[in-house]
């Protein structure tokens, strides 16, 4: 069904769908992480992480170096629980996608006009030799602001290291409009962040996914029958469910510089189900569109429950859907009940590898925990139609390249991808 703008109406993640979520499902549960995990750097907390990639989603190697980006905070200044107060985007590099070396902060000091740098994505600018664009969330506490933004610069490398230049001017891209997506006036618990930029293979246009909330005054609308879905007889929906209204949003780029954007209606909404659908991203495979997001146990609506982890939706009709929850419930990769907070902020790459960061690992003493702030073991995910399966555990922080970036054109990068696959 299309709305007046000619865009498909949002697909619904219903309460009936979420009732099928089961923690410890063996095909959708992350294996337990050992208490004695290694730390990639003892100077910085590391959490939300994403690779350097092309605009089509493939992980890029630049002059033989793999590069990843992460939110980081100085361990000597911030504790694990207040790390967001010092959040900046840092970068790491390695040969082959493991044993990462910290390179520094990406943005120049003072470039961000707001207090914090939160999650997004980083791409090689198409058709360029070494131009890089980071899309991130520029965040302020007072006044409350959360703005998807862009910053541009250049990547350089030699035999010893990788470094960046530029990244000294931030451009705001779009803001919550109160029409498609709740703004602060409508919902002071609003979410509007985590831009993920990509080219849609169906129409060749550039879009950005992001986390948002359904546009409405928080708590003023009752959860309807469509949002509830086909539930068993006598199933009651708690009144408090109306306070949860997550949405996976999308915007369309209006120029080649990717600095001007138009907001479109949400792709998926979770009104009455969950209040957060963070870091949405997309994988196109075998004619299907897989939409992934992450969410918390703590953000589920009253009367529902599920683990921290990855949730997903699949469309047989391209990026605008309609979507159905993967595995019937939406759960793709959850934490085990024995370690419910072991990992978070999973990112599913186009090769099926899933990276995340370690959060909190319990010891044999139930009163003793170890905070992570480092990358978790990488998981291999198999996507088969409307189902997903956990199949392998790789090394800690293993993020290998899929293509070698070549400056000439996109066709040469396709050839480089085949070369890497054949190695």
Curated annotation (Swiss-Prot):
Keywords: Carbohydrate metabolism, Glycosyltransferase, Secreted, Transferase. The active site is at residues 48, 278. Changing residue 308 to N: No change in activity. This is Levansucrase. It is found in: Secreted. It holds the Pfam family Glyco_hydro_68. The record marks 194 as: Transition state stabilizer.
């Amino acid at each position: 069904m299309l709305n007046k703008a000619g865009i498909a109406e949002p697909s619904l993640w219903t309460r009936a769908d979420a009732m099928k979520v089961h923690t410890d499902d063996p095909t959708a549960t992350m294996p337990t992480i050992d208490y004695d995990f290694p730390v990639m750097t003892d100077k910085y907390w590391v959490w939300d992480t994403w690779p350097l990639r092309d605009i089509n989603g493939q992980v890029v190697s630049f002059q033989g170096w793999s590069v990843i980006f992460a939110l980081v905070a100085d361990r000597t200044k911030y504790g694990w629980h207040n790390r967001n107060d010092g959040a900046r985007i840092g970068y790491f590099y390695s040969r082959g996608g493991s044993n990462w070396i910290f390179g520094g902060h990406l943005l120049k000091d003072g470039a961000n006009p707001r207090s914090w740098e939160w999650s997004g994505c980083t791409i090689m600018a198409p058709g360029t030799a070494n131009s890089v664009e980071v899309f991130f969330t520029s965040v302020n506490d007072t006044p409350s602001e959360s703005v998807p933004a862009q910053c541009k610069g250049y990547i350089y490398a030699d035999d010893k290291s990788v470094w960046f230049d530029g990244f000294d001017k931030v451009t705001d891209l779009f803001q919550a409009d109160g029409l498609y997506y709740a703004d602060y006036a409508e919902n002071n618990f609003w979410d509007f962040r985590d831009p993920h930029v990509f080219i849609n293979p169906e129409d060749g246009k550039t879009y950005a996914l992001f986390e948002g909330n359904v546009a409405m005054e928080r708590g003023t609308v009752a959860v309807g029958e469509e949002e509830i879905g086909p539930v068993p007889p006598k199933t009651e929906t708690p009144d408090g469910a109306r306070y949860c209204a997550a949405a996976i949003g999308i915007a369309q780029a209006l120029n080649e510089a990717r600095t001007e954007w138009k907001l479109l209606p949400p792709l998926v909404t979770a009104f009455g189900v969950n209040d957060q659908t963070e870091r949405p991203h997309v994988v196109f495979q075998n004619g299907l569109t897989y939409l992934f997001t992450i969410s918390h146990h703590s953000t589920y609506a009253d009367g529902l429950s599920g683990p921290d982890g990855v949730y997903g939706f699949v469309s047989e009709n391209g990026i605008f859907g309609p979507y159905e929850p993967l595995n019937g419930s939406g759960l793709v990769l959850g934490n085990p009940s024995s370690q419910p907070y072991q990992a978070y902020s999973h990112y599913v790459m186009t090769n099926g590898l899933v990276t995340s960061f370690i959060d909190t690992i319990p010891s044999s003493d139930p009163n003793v925990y170890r905070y992570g702030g480092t990358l978790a073991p990488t998981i291999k995910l198999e996507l088969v139609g409307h189902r997903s399966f956990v199949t392998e555990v790789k090394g800690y922080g293993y993020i290998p390249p899929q293509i070698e970036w070549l400056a000439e054109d996109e066709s040469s990068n396709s050839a480089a991808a085949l070369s890497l696959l054949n190695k």
